[in-house]
């Protein structure tokens, strides 16, 4: 970033905004980068502004019972706000005075008034000076008000963020991320955009009073006829506005529905393709789009009428004011033209400025009240700690998470009741919901310094809640907790902040080289780090998107271990690690490196329990056991079934099963679910979409999965998994994740109205608490991952020294926070967020316009029709113009007398002028034909939007995964949210306005030129100057806008990142560090936005200066060249004043159109994506013998269409190579093996070795080479859809879309209810579905949030059974499963898929024992393919992963497992351990 020229600019340079010239020049010549942007002044920095407002807000809180945020804002900004308001008023007053001088000029041409002719030239000079003064007052005032609005937004952004970091977990459970993002993006934009209009709430009434006084002098009481019409029109416009809002509110729900499903499809596009559901998903979205467009059209027609009313009103105002007066008293020309000019100003004040100002105040006060409520929410209270305490003691503690879930279920119940699915047991599902039960009851234990306590228990038992209570996140309602307060924490779902690996581990604690190296070694990160070119200085994106799940988990653990604390809370830190790595880390890090520290480890592994000093087993929130391992064996022989839930499912009664399901539901929000996406959007949030996104959610959040850009969300939006991916630009690089500005308002004066913040979608209530308990990034393979994660060494030499050396004794005076200011610079900050570089030029190309016009054939005809109508209008004007001199000549003899003597009749010459004005007063006379021109245009443009959405949806659904893998989810979602909103809402009316204004200007110029040909000579250079100036400015402004929109992403992304890691942040006390990061992100955005506002003002001022020169030329040409024609001077000057406002407006509209057409460019970019080959790759080449050729083709077609294929499920793989993206490294190389029909094959390999990749390659979801045959049919000889239908799939990330159970199981509607129920019975889903009101018609929302992860897996299983697939692919089906569901899946696999070929990637040894063969993948290749007996007898990876004792049991277990009855599983300890072994391979 560079030093700003503003610092040294002179007063004149500041007044004329000349200091922006260097950046405008640079932007015109080359592409602008972040380094070209100027530093902000200290008065605009987030630190200073937030400190100022926070001080006033604290004062307000301290002094009053009922604090008001507006009082704090008033004390900070009021006087500057009023100063600019007064300047703005003076500028507006000059507009009211101009018509007086115009009247005097016209009067000076009166034949009876020759004495005044000499002063006409001075009056002309006075009129020109008024324009110059207005220009010099208005622009600095508007800029000053925009600047204050920006400062208010920055101060409130910062205040909201600081408050967010202090909120209690209970409050966070009730706030959705969509609400938070909406609070920041939607509400606060109102200050930036609206503050310049706010003063018109008092300026407009004063102006109207002044104008009415001046008009009274001309027309007496008849003045009120025109005013009455304007007031009626203002009320009519308000009514139309209300009707439009009604349609938009109805439409918001439909948009939301469409975006929720679109985001679910985009996030799970792999599953959609695997199930061959593209057509079904397209149909669902197109049906929703149809309903949405009906409402869009209604809203657009109403807005069109509203907009047209303004254009047409001018004529009526003049007509109603002048005509009655003229009929009764007669009128002179001076009065007509003066009245016309006054009415133009009056119309703007009454129908535009005043209503807009009232709306601005209404919106702003609403936003301030929302923020005020938020700032008064309950804060997190830190517990009182005793720093001298060495033990951790808990005495009889009970705690509640506040019941926040009842509303969700009530809503689900209500939604389904509304669908009239009546059913007798509507209440069954909800009746036994124990809302408000304590999450922990009566917990007591004591750990001494240096001890390790293992906490175990089934899902939902309260393990994480226990850690939260120790950290102070969950307040105990009874009992006492004692510890020193110096805590370190490792979350269950690894949280990575944007920054380097080193930053993530040190996390603001002072750096100690020896400690850092020891921790890296103990957490097995050395080898991973050595593979990166930048080593530990590699910059990670949000959520650590470039890392595997195991790497993220180890970095999170390293961060916790690096901090020197008294108590370490480790919440299931080994979840994503293979067994070898886990063993090494547990021994070297937890047992040796941290030997002298107090540790609480949440785990379910038997080996960990054996080594723990104390064991605490929780069951349903209570202590099931507390003591040592030997006591556990003696006192609780059945402990393993409680711990692992190892009873077989069949033993449970229906009631017991119901309670398990209910418990899962009751606690679902605390149970992280790797597939939870967080693109959230508040329901009203999509009134107009723009960036999140949501970002996001990317629901925001982006849920997007709002991947950044939100991302949530988006960027953002989208952008992190939530918001993060929403980047859509370096060309719009980032998320926008949040779509929120009212459509249709001008884009120029506001921050990108179709904003680029995180896009967050989803009408779902996803609380922030849920977000924190979700895994930070999709479990799916990250395509950015370095493919060469060659496996870590199988064994690390034990570090004998680790236990003896205490790395914490080398403490530097104390672990202090780093000095942040030098540490983070803006360039690094931006590097933390992935950008999708879009090659979209800075200015929209003509090719884009051409393609847009030709998308729908009727658009061309409509545009031609508009031109024809316009030519008819101009022709009519010219005809009148030809007749005009004759009429004037005929009446000239009588005109003087009648002017003096007769008052009852309008003077004939005046009449001809007036008639002429009616036909030609081009600024307002599009009356009769305007409607015929505008409505077809708006209607057709919405049809074009419909066509583009349809093409883009098809394109995305049919694009190959290798292309989709290079795009961010949030980026794709932004096209469907933000850009489609632009095409639906903003573009049609902006184009209509532009066409209307352009034609008005052309018409006015033609008329003026015909009346006074000399003026044409002045007009040509002026229009040329406008066009050149626009082209010059557009290059820079669009780039600045793009940089500004990118600058938004880090703000929303940082918010979501902070929320995801809030518990970690608070445990480490890093709030100030993150506030500083947030301020850096804000300052980065401010630098871009301030520069954009300044260059925009430079441009507007230059336009006005060109016009002032034009007006001076017109005035003096007309004064000096016109002889006796007072009417001619009147028309020329009146039209010239009218042209001024209209031409500026037209130029601004053209810039808006260009800006909005960038959305069209992005949509075209997606439409042009390559598609998957739906047809066989190698079609048979015709041979010379055409008959033989036909036979071959027919035979091949028969193979493809044979209903029985595949019949056996035999699979042969030859030389299979797979890549995630074109041109990327091969993840698998030369894989060859074959599987017999009905065989079960287990895939073995370390984390990141390519097991999931192999399953994707089977489905042709990657870039593959080689060949696979199923039952003798090669994948090259049949279509992709046919090939994929041969497989049943249970993916790692389960896909449940928003829709009924029936739709989720059978989206094409191929099966009857009877068949669906039969399959539901087979897989154990019937008891689940029957508990919901409506049963199969119950609508699942938010990714099936009312189902546990296990039930979602059963849904996938049911889909596979229904598809009657012969080959089943399972990718980690037991990950995050409760043991009961896991048993059902095992049982179903044995029964329903007994004759099928099963390929299984799994971490549980127990599941692998049922496989006949194993395929070991290592370093991208097949290392071994053998039976279990062979593998156990040789030195293999499988053998290494199993302890010697277990190995002895495996062979007999293998042989007898099928016959052995499991009804008494817990009887023998050995059998139990073996059955529940959750060790991961």
From Swiss-Prot:
<feature type="transmembrane region" description="Helical; Name=1">
    <location>
        <begin position="78"/>
        <end position="98"/>
    </location>
</feature>
<dbReference type="InterPro" id="IPR050173">
    <property type="entry name" value="ABC_transporter_C-like"/>
</dbReference>
<dbReference type="GO" id="GO:0048240">
    <property type="term" value="P:sperm capacitation"/>
</dbReference>
<keyword id="KW-0472">Membrane</keyword>
<dbReference type="GO" id="GO:0015701">
    <property type="term" value="P:bicarbonate transport"/>
</dbReference>
<keyword id="KW-0869">Chloride channel</keyword>
<keyword id="KW-0597">Phosphoprotein</keyword>
<dbReference type="GO" id="GO:0035377">
    <property type="term" value="P:transepithelial water transport"/>
</dbReference>
<feature type="transmembrane region" description="Helical; Name=6">
    <location>
        <begin position="340"/>
        <end position="358"/>
    </location>
</feature>
<dbReference type="GO" id="GO:0005789">
    <property type="term" value="C:endoplasmic reticulum membrane"/>
</dbReference>
<feature type="domain" description="ABC transporter 1">
    <location>
        <begin position="423"/>
        <end position="645"/>
    </location>
</feature>
<feature type="topological domain" description="Cytoplasmic">
    <location>
        <begin position="147"/>
        <end position="195"/>
    </location>
</feature>
<keyword id="KW-0067">ATP-binding</keyword>
<feature type="modified residue" description="Phosphoserine">
    <location>
        <position position="699"/>
    </location>
</feature>
<feature type="topological domain" description="Extracellular">
    <location>
        <begin position="1117"/>
        <end position="1130"/>
    </location>
</feature>
<feature type="topological domain" description="Cytoplasmic">
    <location>
        <begin position="359"/>
        <end position="858"/>
    </location>
</feature>
<feature type="modified residue" description="Phosphothreonine">
    <location>
        <position position="716"/>
    </location>
</feature>
<feature type="binding site">
    <location>
        <position position="1220"/>
    </location>
    <ligand>
        <name>ATP 2</name>
    </ligand>
</feature>
<dbReference type="InterPro" id="IPR047082">
    <property type="entry name" value="CFTR1_ATP-bd_dom1"/>
</dbReference>
<comment type="similarity">
    <text>Belongs to the ABC transporter superfamily. ABCC family. CFTR transporter (TC 3.A.1.202) subfamily.</text>
</comment>
<dbReference type="InterPro" id="IPR011527">
    <property type="entry name" value="ABC1_TM_dom"/>
</dbReference>
<keyword id="KW-0413">Isomerase</keyword>
<feature type="modified residue" description="Phosphoserine">
    <location>
        <position position="795"/>
    </location>
</feature>
<feature type="topological domain" description="Extracellular">
    <location>
        <begin position="880"/>
        <end position="918"/>
    </location>
</feature>
<dbReference type="GO" id="GO:0060081">
    <property type="term" value="P:membrane hyperpolarization"/>
</dbReference>
<feature type="transmembrane region" description="Helical; Name=9">
    <location>
        <begin position="991"/>
        <end position="1011"/>
    </location>
</feature>
<feature type="transmembrane region" description="Helical; Name=10">
    <location>
        <begin position="1014"/>
        <end position="1034"/>
    </location>
</feature>
<keyword id="KW-0868">Chloride</keyword>
<keyword id="KW-1003">Cell membrane</keyword>
<comment type="function">
    <text>Epithelial ion channel that plays an important role in the regulation of epithelial ion and water transport and fluid homeostasis. Mediates the transport of chloride ions across the cell membrane. Possesses an intrinsic ATPase activity and utilizes ATP to gate its channel; the passive flow of anions through the channel is gated by cycles of ATP binding and hydrolysis by the ATP-binding domains. The ion channel is also permeable to HCO(3)(-); selectivity depends on the extracellular chloride concentration.</text>
</comment>
<keyword id="KW-0832">Ubl conjugation</keyword>
<dbReference type="InterPro" id="IPR017871">
    <property type="entry name" value="ABC_transporter-like_CS"/>
</dbReference>
<feature type="binding site">
    <location>
        <position position="492"/>
    </location>
    <ligand>
        <name>ATP 1</name>
    </ligand>
</feature>
<feature type="lipid moiety-binding region" description="S-palmitoyl cysteine">
    <location>
        <position position="1396"/>
    </location>
</feature>
<feature type="topological domain" description="Cytoplasmic">
    <location>
        <begin position="1"/>
        <end position="77"/>
    </location>
</feature>
<dbReference type="GO" id="GO:0019869">
    <property type="term" value="F:chloride channel inhibitor activity"/>
</dbReference>
<feature type="topological domain" description="Extracellular">
    <location>
        <begin position="99"/>
        <end position="122"/>
    </location>
</feature>
<dbReference type="InterPro" id="IPR003439">
    <property type="entry name" value="ABC_transporter-like_ATP-bd"/>
</dbReference>
<keyword id="KW-0325">Glycoprotein</keyword>
<dbReference type="GO" id="GO:0005254">
    <property type="term" value="F:chloride channel activity"/>
</dbReference>
<keyword id="KW-0564">Palmitate</keyword>
<feature type="binding site">
    <location>
        <begin position="457"/>
        <end position="464"/>
    </location>
    <ligand>
        <name>ATP 1</name>
    </ligand>
</feature>
């Amino acid at each position: 970033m560079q030093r700003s020229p503003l610092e040294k600019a002179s007063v004149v340079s500041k007044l004329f905004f000349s200091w922006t010239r260097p950046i405008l020049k640079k932007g015109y010549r080359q592409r602008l980068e972040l380094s070209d942007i100027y530093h902000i002044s200290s008065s605009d920095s987030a630190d200073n502004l937030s400190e100022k407002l926070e001080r006033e807000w604290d004062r307000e809180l301290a002094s009053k019972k009922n604090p008001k945020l507006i009082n704090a804002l008033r004390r900070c900004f009021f006087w500057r706000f009023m100063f600019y308001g007064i300047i703005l008023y003076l500028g507006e007053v000059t507009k009211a005075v101009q018509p007086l001088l115009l009247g005097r000029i016209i009067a000076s041409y009166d034949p009876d008034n020759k004495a005044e002719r000499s002063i006409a030239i001075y009056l002309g000079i006075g009129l020109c000076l008024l324009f110059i003064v207005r220009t010099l007052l208005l622009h600095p005032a508007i800029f000053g008000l925009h600047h204050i609005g920006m400062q208010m937004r920055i101060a409130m952004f910062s205040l909201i963020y600081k408050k967010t970091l202090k909120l209690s977990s209970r409050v966070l459970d009730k706030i959705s991320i969509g609400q938070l993002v909406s609070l920041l993006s939607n509400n606060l934009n109102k200050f930036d955009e609206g503050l310049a209009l706010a003063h018109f709430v008092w300026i407009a009434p004063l102006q109207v009073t002044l104008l009415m006084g001046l008009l009274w002098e001309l027309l007496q009481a008849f003045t009120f006829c025109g005013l009455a019409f304007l007031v009626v029109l203002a009320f009519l416009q308000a009514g139309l506005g209300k009707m439009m809002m009604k349609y938009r509110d109805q439409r918001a729900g439909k948009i939301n529905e469409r975006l929720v499903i679109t985001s679910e499809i985009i996030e799970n596009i792999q599953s959609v393709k695997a199930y061959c559901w593209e057509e079904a998903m397209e149909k669902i979205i197109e049906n929703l789009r149809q309903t949405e467009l009906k409402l869009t059209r209604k809203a657009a027609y109403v807005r069109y009428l509203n907009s047209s009313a303004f254009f047409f009103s001018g004529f009526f105002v003049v007509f109603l004011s002048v005509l009655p007066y003229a009929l009764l008293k007669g009128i002179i020309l001076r009065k007509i033209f003066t009245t016309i000019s006054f009415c133009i100003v009056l119309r703007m004040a009454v129908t535009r400025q005043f209503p807009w100002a009232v709306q601005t105040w209404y919106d702003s006060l609403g936003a301030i009240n929302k923020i005020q409520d938020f700032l008064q929410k309950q804060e997190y209270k830190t517990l009182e700690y005793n720093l001298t305490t060495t033990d951790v003691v808990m005495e009889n503690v009970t705690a509640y998470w506040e019941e926040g879930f009842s509303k969700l279920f009530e809503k689900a119940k209500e939604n389904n009741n509304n669908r009239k699915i009546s059913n007798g047991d509507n209440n069954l599902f909800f009746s036994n919901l124990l809302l408000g039960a304590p999450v922990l009851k009566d917990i007591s234990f004591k750990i001494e310094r240096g001890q390790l306590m293992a906490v175990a228990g089934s899902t939902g038992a309260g393990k994480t809640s226990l850690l939260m209570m120790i950290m102070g996140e969950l307040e105990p309602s009874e009992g006492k907790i004692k510890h020193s307060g110096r805590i370190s924490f490792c979350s269950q779902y690894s949280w990575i902040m944007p920054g380097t690996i080193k930053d993530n581990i040190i996390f603001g604690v002072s750096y100690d080289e020896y400690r850092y190296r020891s921790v890296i070694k103990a957490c097995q990160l050395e080898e991973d780090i050595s593979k990166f070119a930048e080593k530990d200085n590699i910059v990670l994106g949000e959520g650590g998107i470039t890392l595997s799940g195991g790497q993220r988990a180890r970095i999170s653990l390293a961060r916790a271990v690096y901090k020197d604390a008294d108590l370490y809370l480790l919440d299931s830190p080994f979840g994503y690690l293979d067994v070898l790595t886990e063993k090494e880390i547990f021994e070297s890090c937890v047992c040796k490196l941290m030997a002298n520290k107090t540790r609480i480890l949440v785990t379910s592994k038997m080996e960990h329990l054996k080594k723990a000093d104390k064991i605490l087993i929780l069951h349903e929130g209570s202590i099931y056991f507390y003591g040592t391992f030997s006591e556990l064996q003696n006192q609780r022989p059945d402990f393993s079934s409680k711990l692992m839930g190892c009873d077989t499912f069949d033993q449970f009664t229906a009631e017991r099963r119901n309670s398990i399901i209910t418990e899962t539901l009751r606690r679902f929000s605390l149970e992280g679910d790797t597939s939870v996406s967080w693109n959230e959007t508040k329901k009203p949030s999509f009134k107009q979409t723009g960036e999140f996104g949501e970002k996001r959610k990317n629901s925001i959040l982006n849920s997007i999965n709002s991947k950044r850009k939100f991302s949530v969300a988006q960027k953002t939006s989208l952008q992190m998994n939530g918001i993060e991916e929403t980047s859509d630009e370096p060309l719009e690089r980032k998320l926008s994740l949040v779509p929120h500005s009212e459509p249709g308002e001008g884009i120029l004066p506001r921050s990108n109205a179709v904003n680029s913040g995180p896009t967050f979608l989803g009408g779902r209530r996803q609380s922030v608490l849920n977000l924190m308990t979700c895994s930070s990034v999709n479990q799916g393979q990250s395509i950015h991952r370095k493919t060469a994660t060659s496996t870590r060494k199988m064994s690390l030499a034990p570090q004998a020294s680790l236990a003896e050396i205490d790395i914490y004794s080398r403490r530097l005076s104390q672990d202090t926070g780093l000095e942040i200011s030098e540490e983070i610079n803006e360039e690094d900050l931006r590097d933390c967020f992935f950008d999708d570089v879009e090659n979209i030029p800075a200015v929209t190309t003509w090719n884009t316009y051409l393609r847009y016009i030709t998308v729908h054939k009727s658009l061309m005809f409509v545009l031609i029709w508009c031109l024809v109508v316009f030519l008819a209008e101009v022709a009519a004007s010219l005809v009148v113009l030809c007749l005009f001199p004759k009429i004037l000549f005929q009446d000239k003899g009588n005109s003087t007398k009648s002017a003096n003597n007769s008052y009852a009749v309008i003077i004939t010459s005046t009449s001809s002028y007036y008639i002429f004005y009616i036909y030609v007063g081009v600024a307002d006379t599009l009356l009769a034909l305007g409607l015929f021109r505008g409505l077809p245009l708006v209607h057709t443009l919405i049809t074009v939007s419909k066509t583009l959405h349809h093409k883009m949806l098809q394109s995305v659904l049919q694009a190959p995964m290798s292309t989709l893998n290079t795009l961010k989810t949030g980026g794709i979602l932004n096209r469907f949210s933000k850009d489609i909103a632009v095409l639906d809402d903003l573009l049609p009316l902006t184009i209509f306005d532009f066409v209307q204004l352009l034609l008005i200007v052309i018409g006015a110029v033609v008329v003026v030129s015909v009346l006074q040909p000399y003026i044409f000579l002045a007009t040509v250079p002026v229009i040329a100057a406008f066009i050149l100036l626009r082209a010059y400015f557009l290059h820079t402004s669009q780039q600045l806008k793009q940089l500004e929109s990118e600058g938004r992403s880090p703000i929303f992304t940082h918010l979501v990142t902070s929320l995801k890691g809030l518990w970690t942040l608070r445990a480490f006390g890093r709030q100030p560090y993150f506030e500083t990061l947030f301020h850096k992100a804000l300052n980065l955005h401010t630098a871009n936005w301030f520069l954009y506002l300044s260059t925009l003002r430079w441009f507007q001022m230059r336009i006005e200066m060109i016009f002032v020169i034009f007006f001076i030329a017109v005035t003096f040409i007309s004064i000096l060249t016109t002889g006796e024609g007072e009417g001619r001077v009147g028309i020329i000057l009146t039209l010239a004043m009218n042209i001024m406002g209209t031409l500026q407006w037209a130029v601004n509209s053209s810039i808006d159109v260009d800006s909005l057409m960038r959305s069209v460019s992005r949509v075209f970019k997606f439409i042009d994506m390559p598609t998957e080959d739906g047809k066989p790759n190698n079609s048979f080449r015709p041979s010379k013998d055409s008959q033989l050729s036909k036979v071959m083709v027919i035979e091949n077609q028969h193979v493809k269409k044979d209903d029985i294929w595949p019949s056996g499920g035999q699979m042969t793989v030859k030389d299979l190579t797979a890549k995630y993206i074109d041109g990327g490294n091969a993840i698998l190389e030369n894989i060859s093996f074959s599987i017999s029909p009905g065989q079960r094959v287990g895939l073995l390999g370390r984390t990141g070795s390519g097991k999931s990749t192999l399953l994707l390659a089977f489905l042709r979801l990657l870039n593959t080479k080689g060949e696979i045959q199923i039952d003798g049919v090669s994948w090259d000889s049949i279509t992709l859809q046919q090939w994929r239908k041969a497989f049943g799939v249970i993916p790692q990330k389960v896909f449940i879309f928003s829709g009924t159970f029936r739709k989720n199981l059978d989206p094409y509607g191929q099966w009857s209810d009877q068949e669906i129920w039969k399959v539901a019975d087979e897989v154990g889903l019937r008891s689940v579905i029957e508990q919901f009101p409506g049963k199969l018609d119950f609508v699942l929302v938010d990714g099936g949030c009312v189902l546990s992860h296990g039930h979602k897996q059963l849904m996938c299983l049911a889909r596979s059974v229904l598809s009657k697939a012969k080959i089943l692919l399972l990718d980690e089906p037991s990950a995050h499963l409760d043991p009961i569901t896991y048993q059902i899946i095992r049982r179903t696999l044995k029964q329903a898929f007994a004759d099928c070929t099963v390929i299984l990637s799994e971490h549980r040894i127990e599941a692998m024992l049922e496989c006949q063969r194993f395929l070991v993948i290592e370093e991208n290749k097949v290392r071994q393919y053998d039976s279990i007996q062979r593998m156990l007898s040789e030195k293999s990876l499988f053998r290494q992963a199993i302890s010697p004792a277990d190995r002895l049991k495996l062979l007999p277990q293998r042989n007898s497992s099928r016959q052995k009855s499991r009804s008494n599983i817990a009887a023998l300890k050995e059998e139990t351990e073996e059955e529940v072994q959750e060790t991961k391979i």
